[in-house]
Structure formats: C-alpha cells, structure tokens
C-alpha cells in the first residue's frame, strides 16, 4: 500500500519504484560520500511529471514511517489511534524538555544576579 525507499547519491531507487508501480512511494534521501545528502534530496524532489515521489528530509526515515502510517490509517483505522497516541507522547516529551530548559534558565539567572 506504501513503500519507503531510501537512496544516496543520485537516489535511483525511489524514482525507479515510482515509475514501475501505482503504490505510493516515500523517498528518503540519505547522506552519501559527497554533498551531505543534498544530491539525494534533489534527485528525489525533481522527479519528472507522472512519476510522483513523496520526499522526506535527509536521513528522515522516522518521518517517512510516520507518513506511511498516516497514509495507511486511511484504510486501517486502528493505526489512526496509534498515531494519536504517538503524537501525544511526542507532545509530552517536548513539554518536559521545555520545562527543563525554563528551569535551567531560571537557575542561570539566579547565578548572575
């Protein structure tokens, strides 16, 4: 129902898969030996007309997996609930990190007064 394909350099795999199937393809550009993955990113986002590939950020397989779950959740409702739970966990982690940063800033202000 959805394929995640990674590629470094000219990143042929995502584009080749997209040209051969009607299944949604998510391309993940990977860092290679040169250009720090920018070449891979350009290869994936510059697909010709009629060969769509959803492009993620460089080395962003995690986001590709989340995006694939979002696509699959349209047909498989149980995945939607799992995604909502996952996003709630992420939100709680961000709030905890924000609270920690604010506490650290308060302590630093106290040291310089």
Locate predicted features.
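Short glycine/serine/threonine-rich phosphate/pyrophosphate-binding segments
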Residues: 7-16, 35-38, 61-65
């Amino acid at each position: 129902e959805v394929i995640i394909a990674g590629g470094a350099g000219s990143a042929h795999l995502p584009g080749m898969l997209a040209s051969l199937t009607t299944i949604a393809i998510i391309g993940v550009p990977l860092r290679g030996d040169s250009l720090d993955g920018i070449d891979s990113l350009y290869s994936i986002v510059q697909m010709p007309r009629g060969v769509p590939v959803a492009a993620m950020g460089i080395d962003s397989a995690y986001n590709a997996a989340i995006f694939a779950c979002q696509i699959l959740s349209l047909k498989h409702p149980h995945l939607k609930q799992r995604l909502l739970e996952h996003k709630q966990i992420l939100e709680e982690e961000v709030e905890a990190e924000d609270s920690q940063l604010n506490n650290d800033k308060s302590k630093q202000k106290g040291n310089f007064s």
